[in-house]
């Protein structure tokens, strides 16, 4: 069986069609999602961002699957109980802002055991998710605020913008995968650097190896 899939110059749609084929495909989980790993200069830990490329406007159930997929990658890089922050514009639930409602529901899902292997926090703005000092200044009581290992995006626009901001403005090194298949799928952009492509292969191998340990 395949341990990882790399698209090279093949069109992304062709790769995904093959992965999702009901008879010969590699689909494993309920949903395929994109997970990006960043090493940001000056930041004290690796950071995972999901989903910046696959899930356009995920609903609550899709977000649960996106978290489960991201946890598998987090485990592969050594984060055994990652903190997953549900990113929003504010820190309080506002019915007019659906992402905050979903965030609260995802926190409850983790507390009830529906989502396992991680701690889910939110709703949180980006600064309070990754900076302890910012969380303290805002008076956020959650002890995990500022300690996020995984950033859950409310939609693809937010994820895409954050991905490019980290790479272009912050000079981050990155790797990315499609997760949720029987093997991690490497779908990099033709604009990505050679180092990003190499990083993605290494991350795919680590994720596949961790999956093998758990099977």
Where would I find each of the regions flagged by the language model?
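Short, small-residue-biased leader/transition segments that mark boundaries at the very start
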Residues: 1-6
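Flexible, glycine/charged-enriched surface loops at secondary-structure junctions
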Residues: 78-84, 113-123, 210-215
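Active-site rim loops that border cofactor/substrate pockets in soluble metabolic enzymes
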Residues: 89-150
């Amino acid at each position: 069986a395949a341990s990882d899939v790399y698209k090279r110059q093949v069109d992304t749609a062709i790769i995904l069609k093959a992965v999702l084929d009901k008879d010969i495909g590699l689909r494993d989980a309920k949903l395929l999602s994109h997970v990006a790993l960043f090493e940001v200069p000056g930041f004290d830990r690796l950071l995972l961002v999901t989903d910046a490329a696959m899930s356009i406007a995920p609903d609550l159930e899709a977000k649960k699957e996106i978290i489960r997929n991201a946890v598998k990658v987090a485990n592969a890089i050594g984060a055994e109980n990652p903190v997953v922050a549900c990113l929003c514009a504010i820190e309080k639930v506002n019915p007019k802002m659906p992402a905050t409602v979903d965030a609260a529901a995802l926190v409850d899902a983790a507390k009830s055991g529906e989502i396992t292997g991680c701690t889910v926090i939110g709703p949180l703005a980006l600064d309070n998710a990754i900076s302890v000092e910012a969380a303290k200044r805002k008076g956020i009581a959650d002890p995990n605020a500022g300690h996020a290992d995984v950033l859950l995006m409310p939609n693809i626009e937010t994820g895409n913008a954050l991905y490019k901001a980290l790479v272009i403005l912050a000079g981050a090194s990155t790797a990315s995968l499609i997760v949720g298949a029987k093997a991690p799928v490497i779908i990099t952009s033709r604009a990505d650097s050679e180092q990003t492509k190499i990083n993605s292969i290494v991350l795919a191998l680590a994720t596949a190896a961790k999956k093998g340990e758990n099977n």
